[in-house]
Amino acid sequence: LLSMMAARAGAGRVVACEENPAIADSARRIVAANGYADRIRVVTGNSTELELESDLEGHADVIVSEIVSNNLLAEGVLTTLADAASRLLAPGGQMIPMGGAVMVALANWGAATRTHMAEVAGFDLDGFNALAQVPRNVAVSDATLTLHSTPAALLSFDFTGKAAREPHRGAATLVSDGTPVSGIVQWIRLDLDAEASYENRPGPDAKSHWGAQFYPFDAPLDLAAGTELRVVGVHDGHQLLVWREDRCPRSELPSS
């Protein structure tokens, strides 16, 4: 899809890279059906395996990608784009997006308890809730998910240079609006270029195939308006963990 958009916008030569052979084969047929077979070539494989001359016929003037996940990192975006920027992009070329950020805010998610274990057949199974997956995925359009602080960038990344050293930490100070909160919600921002950006910030009118991630507190916090709460995040290049500073997790990195 991105390749056909590039060709429609005027690109004279486009190389699309798709690792899954079945999807790549279907993509070739779709490209031909839309009349772009003369300008778009679909290469099967990972972009890190592309040969500069045989696959690309030289450095690319523009590299457009969409390989980010709900936490921005899970698809190996940092190492993949660092390789593309350093090896495949022409001097002065443009990476789209050129960067991204992990965004966070204090939040309430009313529907979070709907999947909690409670009483079954007269037995109290509440203890199983300690095994619930964290973070929990939530649709950004979920009407029961409400933000109660000014959003902040917890981790920011430059996709035009070398990948950040791992593990990488970041911190942000969130200011409460005075509403009791039950956790931290995380979403993503993509900086397409120096002027335009995309953000799947949660809200009732939000539309995105990317979801948000919710990190619940052990118990709701009743904070006065203006109260500052410091949030910490750490990643290993693929996984992300977020917590409030006074509640350090058992491990600073998620287990694989």
Locate the predicted segments by residue:
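Class I SAM-binding transferase module
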Residues: 2-256
